[in-house]
Amino acid sequence: MDSAVSKLGFIPDGQLPKLINQDAVTLELKKCRDSIRKRIRTYNFKEPKLTDDEITKLAAKICGASEERKSYRKILAILLLIDRPSRITHFVDEGVSDQDLPLEIVETLSTRPLRRRSFDLRRRGDPLAKPLRCFMCPRKWRKSTVERFEKYQWSLLAPFLSQDGPRLFRFKIPDKAILPFERWERIGQQGGFSHVYEAEIHPDHHGFHVQDLDAQDGRGDHGHETTTNPPSTRSNVFAVKRLKTQNRDDFLHEFDMHKRVSKNLHQHLIPLLAAYEQHGIYHLIFPLAGADLEKYWRNKEQETNQEAARWVAEQCQGLAGAVAAIHRSYTLSDSLSFRALPGGQSEGETQGVNMSQTNGPPTSIPRQRFAGHCRHGDIKPKNILWFPDGSRQQKETTPRGTLRITDFGAAQYAEHRVPTSGSQNTPIYRPPEADLTAQGTEPDVIVGTSYDIWSLGCVFLEFVAWFLDGWHGVQIFLENRSTVDRACHNFHTGKFFLIESGDAGKTSRARVKPEVDQVRSRPPQPSSLRYLRD
């Protein structure tokens, strides 16, 4: 099977028992026996001749059907790939089985003068580092043959990616491992901190079930309840986010943020399926969305009927509940895997707080300092994904889908009474507090969880503009409020507020741009749609 990310292919786990079965192994062993005479005459070594009964027993042993319950299927497959199937008997005799793979390369110094460094293959973690006899029978293998064995063993060791219920797995994949990706295509525009790929993972090599979150019992208005495990739909196509950073702390920060919010996953939050590291590059695996919200607005023609208005209102309510769920997440100062906001100083203490651990039962954590609630930090249309088949409970012919918040790369924890700065929020959707704090005119202005509320409100206004006038309405709304932004090197941005300088001795103040108020002051729509405008 070809791999989309490696020149060398892989053999899917489910195919191996079909290819290496007792009948096929018996036939191959008999072929090897018949060719032994030629090798004896050529190399002048003794090779034991196997009877038919011995071959049958050996085939059962190779396929794991003997009392040992060891399998040598992968070993035989590797030997077939390098055209050395008759050597399987030496591996079986020494007990070098599939569970010993991958064998490690160990460099050795030749005792002969003027000879280059050599190497052999040995079991992983062997404290005595014993050379394996199977690579010396009937004579020492050539270096090129050993290299081929080491190379092709990875074709049988494609990793299995999975999750275990609410637990998230983080995999450290060997650099030589062949990922079981049958398709790997970049999607969307290049982001500032990551690339996103559409990856088709072979069904034998993942255990992900993309849940229909609308069917979960624990959806709730604000995501208070823990979701159950509902019937799920299986897909082999996922979104893989490849981080540009090679800083492990940045990767662990985003992973841990997802792990924290996944404990009570809200219907309108994207679930992280797993994460992995290979070649020092970090990846996060998610369900594949149909589009981000901006692309949805651009390509989807709006409908101004009551059902469409209800859907927009429901999605806005759901997104607000998802943001509230994020804000209810918190951490303690001793949780080193969480990154505190710059300058954040915790106040107060938490005694005996029960924190449900991802990989174990709840534990009591005595007297740890409260490090703060979480805020997303970068809510914008591009960080809201549209899933076309996510609203199965809607009683309509064509489900309109579900919106879910994604990208926790900028999410941070900060005690909500502590001033913070240095946000990575997209300039257009930043709140006035960010500019007032940055200018130093209001050093006591709080930039906390309200940061997200402002950003989400901006998205809602654009959502209404799209609902009323389509993508053209979104663009006109942006053009009307676009002004020179001193905080962004005097570029024009479409932020939603103005900073008015105060008179002598007075502080600056922020106010909403008039163009924003114009959206609310538009003439009323049909009576069935008025509630959406409000």
Q: Where in this protein do the model-derived segments appear?
A:
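Structural motif at the C-terminus of the N-lobe alphaC helix and the adjacent alphaC-beta4 loop
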Residues: 229-233, 256-267
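Activation segment/activation loop of eukaryotic-type protein kinase catalytic domains
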Residues: 370-372, 377-429, 435-437
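Conserved short submotifs of the Hanks-type protein kinase catalytic core
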Residues: 279-292
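Catalytic-loop of the protein kinase fold
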Residues: 327-398
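Conserved HxN/HPN-centered segment at the entrance to the catalytic loop
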Residues: 238, 263-275
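Non-catalytic localization/regulatory regions flanking kinase domains
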Residues: 1-233, 244-247
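Conserved C-lobe activation region of Hanks-type protein kinase-like domains
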Residues: 434-526
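Activation segment of protein kinase catalytic domains, centered on the conserved DFG
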Residues: 300-318, 341-347
